[in-house]
Amino acid sequence: MPELPEVETSRRGIEPHLVGATILHAHIRNGRLRWPVSDEIYRLSDTPVLSVQRRAKYLLLELPDGWIIIHLGMSGSLRILPEALPAEKHDHVDLVMSNGKILRYTDPRRFGAWLWTKELEGHNVLAHLGPEPLSGEFNGEYLQQKCAKKKTAIKPWLMDNKLVVGVGNIYASESLFAAGIHPDRLASSLSTEECDLLARVIKAVLLRSIEQGGTTLKDFLQSDGKPGYFAQELQVYGRKGEPCRVCGTPIVATKHAQRATFYCRHCQK
């Protein structure tokens, strides 16, 4: 599933082609996504794009009369293409732009979403989200307050959007490795110093992934059709049985809440 770096990479890639241009019309080939494509999107015509923003894993296209909320789901990607390029099997939504470009949404598993809202505030998919991990609000003090009485393992807690948004399976595993924290540790067992380190490491890992265009493991592509290159820098995720790049101990894979977790027994305590 695309996580924060992949969604931010998509935002940065599509923004220059959308802001200041006008949506001539939307071409919906298959509106049966996780939730049906909103009727308002079908009716778009001669609508300027004012901004392209991100909240958590949602892309937000600001229009004069409302917002398009896009979620990439498990396998979605957005590309900027020449208008004449033929669609393929899993290309479900096109926004045809006045500058001769198309914003094309591709999603083999159709678990993403294209929604419409007049106002972002209070929308059900955005209403109960925690802070952005790259914001000043997310720091060691905040993390310690939220972990202090939490009797659950730190790995699934990091992936809870009520704690912090956008830290999914890949980046939770990578951040815990970088901080030297075992994923099975109770959140409440983390010291002040560990919380401070973990908050800083999460920011660093996410920023590095954004610099590399995100992580492509299967379906994710940047807006220009290229893969994300952070996969080449993964320390533990997807490396079961391979030697730790730091100490040589084989990487272990377990499951938390049906999600694969990767860690080094020697480096993470």
Curated annotation (Swiss-Prot):
Q: Which cofactor does it need?
A: Zn(2+)
Q: What does UniProt list as catalytic?
A: 2 (schiff-base intermediate with dna), 3 (proton donor), 57 (proton donor), 259 (proton donor)
User: What catalytic activity does the UniProt entry give for this protein?
Assistant: Hydrolysis of DNA containing ring-opened 7-methylguanine residues, releasing 2,6-diamino-4-hydroxy-5-(N-methyl)formamidopyrimidine; 2'-deoxyribonucleotide-(2'-deoxyribose 5'-phosphate)-2'-deoxyribonucleotide-DNA = a 3'-end 2'-deoxyribonucleotide-(2,3-dehydro-2,3-deoxyribose 5'-phosphate)-DNA + a 5'-end 5'-phospho-2'-deoxyribonucleoside-DNA + H(+)
Matching PROSITE patterns, A to Z? FPG_CAT (PS51068), ZF_FPG_1 (PS01242), ZF_FPG_2 (PS51066)
The biological process GO terms on file are:
base-excision repair
- Similarity remark: Belongs to the FPG family.
Kindly indicate whether the keyword Zinc belongs to this entry: yes
- Keywords in alphabetical order, please: DNA damage, DNA repair, DNA-binding, Glycosidase, Hydrolase, Lyase, Metal-binding, Multifunctional enzyme, Zinc, Zinc-finger
Q: How is the cofactor bound?
A: Binds 1 zinc ion per subunit.
Task: Name the chain's protein.
Answer: Formamidopyrimidine-DNA glycosylase
Zinc fingers (FPG-type), renumbered ranges: 235-269
Q: Name one GO molecular function term.
A: damaged DNA binding
Gene3D superfamilies reported for this sequence? 1.10.8.50, MutM-like, N-terminal (3.20.190.10)
Record keyword Nucleotide-binding present: no
- Summarize the subunit comment: Monomer.
EC number(s) stated in the UniProt entry for this protein: 3.2.2.23, 4.2.99.18
Per UniProt, where does DNA bind?
A: 90, 109, 150
Q: In terms of domain of life, where is this protein from?
A: Bacteria
Record's function text: Involved in base excision repair of DNA damaged by oxidation or by mutagenic agents. Acts as a DNA glycosylase that recognizes and removes damaged bases. Has a preference for oxidized purines, such as 7,8-dihydro-8-oxoguanine (8-oxoG). Has AP (apurinic/apyrimidinic) lyase activity and introduces nicks in the DNA strand. Cleaves the DNA backbone by beta-delta elimination to generate a single-strand break at the site of the removed base with both 3'- and 5'-phosphates.
Please give the NCBIfam families that the UniProt record associates with this protein. Answer: fpg, PRK01103.1
Originating organism = Salmonella choleraesuis (strain SC-B67)
Looking up CDD domains in the UniProt record yields: EcFpg-like_N
The record, for Pfam families, names: Fapy_DNA_glyco (PF01149), H2TH (PF06831), zf-FPG_IleRS (PF06827)
